[in-house]
């Protein structure tokens, strides 16, 4: 039971059905007994509601690319190799460690951390596009780590560093950090090493050297995949080959945010506002 993230709307706790013993086995139920507010109801079921509307805004969002598809990057099986979303949970005060960034296997503070950029993105075998937010997310997380553990050494393996607009100031700030090293090169392999460490194999594109480097923890900057790439809606929505919405306005359906393309928070908010205004204009014009 946890609050999904700090800005969740509504800002209430939820039960994770994949982890809840009561929902999985029918046994336990201790949470319901100790909840003084009586807020836990294990018998609550999904409800189907039918309504008619003059316009629809599709803001179905995105999901991280499934790391199990990335065989060369450990396929989610290498210990202490986490995704950027999992690291975000570790850094969250509402997360399992109360905001402490530690190794999942033993709770130790990592002294060497590597970030692997474009984990699934810009790859014709996976996501054939740039996910837009991954570089900025990594730069943000590098700052998390530098603030919490100034002595921890960080390596960032990248194809290209993309910091659009004024975000370049963040890139310059992280580059100036003495404990952060940027290595241009596409990671070829992530494998288990001794003591639950992780070995990264990469070719340094600048020096032309093949490197085998060990880290206490590795973070995969997994790509952004539209939810509709794997989950369908009962709507006449034209999708492109990657699962992003292409059109639908003539039917009164307006896509917003990452349902249309990879976007950051600010541009997602702008896209949502624009879609809502178009929907209002459509209803008023009828």
Describe each region flagged by the PLM.
Residues 1-286:
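Residues forming the flavin
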């Amino acid at each position: 039971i946890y609050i999904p993230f700090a800005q969740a709307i509504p800002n209430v706790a939820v039960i994770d059905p994949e982890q809840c013993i009561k929902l999985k086995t029918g046994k336990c139920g201790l949470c319901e007994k100790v909840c003084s507010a009586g807020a836990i109801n294990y018998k609550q079921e999904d409800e189907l509601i039918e309504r008619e509307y003059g316009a629809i805004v599709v803001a179905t969002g995105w999901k991280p690319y499934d790391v199990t598809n990335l065989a060369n990057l450990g396929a989610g099986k290498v210990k202490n190799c986490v995704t950027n979303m999992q690291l975000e949970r570790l850094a969250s005060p509402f997360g399992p460690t109360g905001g402490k960034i530690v190794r999942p296997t033993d709770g130790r503070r990592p002294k060497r951390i590597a970030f692997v950029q474009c984990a699934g993105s810009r790859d014709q075998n996976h996501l054939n596009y740039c996910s837009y937010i991954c570089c900025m997310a990594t730069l943000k997380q590098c700052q998390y780590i530098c603030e919490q553990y100034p002595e921890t050494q960080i390596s960032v393996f990248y194809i290209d560093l993309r910091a659009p607009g004024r975000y370049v100031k963040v890139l310059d700030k992280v580059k100036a950090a003495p404990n952060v090293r940027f290595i241009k090169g596409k990671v070829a392999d992530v494998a288990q090493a001794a003591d639950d460490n992780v070995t990264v194999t990469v070719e340094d594109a600048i020096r032309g050297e093949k490197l085998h480097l060990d880290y206490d923890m590795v973070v995969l900057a997994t790509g952004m995949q539209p939810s509709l790439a794997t989950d369908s809606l009962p709507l006449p929505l034209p999708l492109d080959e990657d699962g992003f919405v292409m059109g639908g306005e003539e039917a009164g359906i307006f896509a917003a945010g990452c349902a249309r393309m990879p976007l950051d928070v600010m541009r997602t908010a702008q896209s949502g506002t624009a879609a809502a205004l178009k929907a209002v204009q459509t209803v008023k014009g009828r």
